[in-house]
């Protein structure tokens, strides 16, 4: 799978996992992250700016951690561990390593 598609999948998985914990507020917080555009919340469709997509995911993780603490960061990492296991180390956003 192409890196841009993988990173988008990671972002959606993080948002949906946070939504399972905190409800629709997860989408509201994701909207505040620069470089991430919510296309269709119900379908789970987003768009990441291709340049800096890894950094956008780092900002998304930081947004949740800032509000909900370290446990929120771990929820993000756990949500995508199967995806990042298949990626090259230099492709993985630093917040998920």
Features from the language model and the residues they span:
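Long, compositionally biased intrinsically disordered regulatory segments in eukaryotic proteins
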Residues: 1-97
